[in-house]
Each structure stands twice: as C-alpha cells, then as structure tokens.
Amino acid sequence: MLRLGVSRTPINRQFVGYEQRRHFIVASALTLGGFVFGKRAKLADAMENGELHNKNNDDEAIRKDRMDKRLKKLSETRPIKPRYEGHVPLYPHERMLLFAISGLKSFFHPEDGNNIVKLGESSAFPFVLESLKQCMLGDETGRRILREQPNITSDTLDMDRLKKMDKNSLGYTYYTWLITEGVSPDTRAPVKYIDDPLQAFIFKRYRQCHDFYHAINGLPIIIEGEIAIKALEAANMGIPMAALGALLAPLRLKPIQKERLYDIYLPWAIRTGLSCKPLINVYWEELLEKDVNELRKELGIQPPPNLRAIRQERSKIRKELKMKYDAYEVGM
C-alpha cells in the first residue's frame, strides 16, 4: 500500500503539469485568435465605412464624418429636432435631472463654471425668457437687439480699439476690468439646452453682458463680487439661477464675508436692480465711447464701495495686528 501511495505522486504531478500546459496553449490560442479575428473585424468595419482605401488619408475628415453620424443618430432620439447650431433638446425628466445635479455641484464646487452654465440653462424656464422677450419688445433698443442679434466677442469689440479709448469711457473701463480679472469675452459658453431659438439668443445675450455689469460697478469676479452681481441680475431681470446663487452661495462664506455681503453688497444689489433701467435693453457695444459716469447716471446705477479695497484694508489690519502680537510674544 505504501508503494502504491508513493507511485501516485509523480503521476499527479505529470497530470497537473499537463493541465497547466493545456491551459496555457488554449489561452494563447484564444488571444491569438482574438487578435487576428478582431483585426479582421476592424478591417471589415473599415471596408464597410469606405475607410480602407482612403487615398487622401484624411483622418480629420473621417473623424468629422463619424461625429456627424453619431450626432445624427443622437438627434433621432431627442424629443424634437435641433433648432439651431449646438442645440441639444432635452426631455422634461432630463432637464429636471440636469437642474438637480448641476445645482448640487454648483453649491459644493462653485469654482467649476460648467456647473453654473448648466444650472443657468436648466433653470431658464420658458416663461422667464418670454418675460424678458416682452420687456425687450417694449423698448426701442431692445427690439433692435432682438432684430440684429449681436454677438459679443473680442473681435466684434476690437480690444485694441478699447485700450486706446479715453480713460473715462465705458470701453476703457471694460477693457481694464477684463485685464485685471484675467478674463475674455470669448470665454462665455454657447447656449445648448434652450429650445426656442429667440429665447436662446436672449439667454446668450444675458450671459455675454454679465461682464459689463461687473465692469460698470467695479466688482471683481471673486465669490462676493459674483454674488452681488447675481443679486443685481435677479432683482433687475428675474433670472432664477441668479436668485438661487444670491440666496444659497453665501451659506458657504466665512463670517466676515457674510457680514460684508449682508451689510453692504446685497442691499446695494437689490436696491440698484429694482431701480435701474432693464439691463437686458442696453446696447453696450454702441456705448463704448460714452463717459462711464454719465452712463451710470442714465442707467440709474450708483457703484458700491470698492470690494477689493475693503478686502485689502482688512488684510493690512490683520497683518499689523499679527506683527504687534508677535512682537509682544518675543518681549514676553
């Protein structure tokens, strides 16, 4: 019995070795087959798409053609056909989901502009945009803006021209604000999720004019300045996203920032927004050479206290107090 038991060990080892070799051979064969047949499948797809014998080897054209096919296929699954370039129609449940997700992301990650953009469009309800349209139709300049549909970019504004304007002009004020803040008119995202083409333009116009509201009031793009401008927009134009930003964004601020907002900038924004001319009807591009102080008077805008100066003064005081405290500690 001992001999029989001992003689089984080499047999088992041989069997295990055979099984291991067999698995290795099978795995190798499957890998090789997948490579060969997978390559053949890719070749077949290329032949079907007419890409195998592309003598020009125009990869960019091929990618564009593929993208067009995907977009066409995607458009067939949408509730309506796209009505302007870049339009992405959404079902009601998709719009609600976009609103909820972008709203949460905007609250926890306000530094991500994409979230703000999506929240703005998903909350731009048709009745709000229709109200803005009626406001524009009731104003001569507003009607002309709707008719001409201008586009605010670095090229249309001619930045070289702006920097040569009079120091007190709107154009120079706007130009220096852009340089100071490190932004450009070209950074505004295109509208995608608003179905009506005219309403889409109105929202684009509101979005593109946002920096003029900053510049004419001397407010930086730091969070306190953004909240103040959002409150101004909400009071002046009734933009839901602006109202949400003005209400919820302060919850994440430091106590001293909240104090400045509630004591100075939010009261100013609401008072100014309710009393000044509807800003959606201002043709900013035609007023670039106008004296900025005269324009403020015409619009009914009185700029708030300089936010950067207030912050710098507080920072200076804190540094002086820290130096005195450190000197006291050394003296002890």
Swiss-Prot record:
Transit peptide: 1-24
Pfam family, one: Coq4
Cofactor entry: Zn(2+)
Compartments it resides in: Mitochondrion inner membrane
GO cellular component labels: extrinsic component of mitochondrial inner membrane
Reaction(s) this enzyme catalyzes, per UniProt: a 4-hydroxy-3-methoxy-5-(all-trans-polyprenyl)benzoate + H(+) = a 2-methoxy-6-(all-trans-polyprenyl)phenol + CO2
Keyword match Metal-binding: yes
Pathway annotation: Cofactor biosynthesis; ubiquinone biosynthesis
InterPro entries to which the protein is assigned, alphabetical: Coq4, Coq4_euk
Family: Belongs to the COQ4 family.
Function: Lyase that catalyzes the C1-decarboxylation of 4-hydroxy-3-methoxy-5-(all-trans-polyprenyl)benzoic acid into 2-methoxy-6-(all-trans-polyprenyl)phenol during ubiquinone biosynthesis.
HAMAP family: Coq4
Stated name of the protein: Ubiquinone biosynthesis protein COQ4, mitochondrial
Species of origin: Zygosaccharomyces rouxii (strain ATCC 2623 / CBS 732 / NBRC 1130 / NCYC 568 / NRRL Y-229)
Lineage of the organism: Eukaryota, Fungi, Dikarya, Ascomycota, Saccharomycotina
Gene that this sequence comes from: COQ4
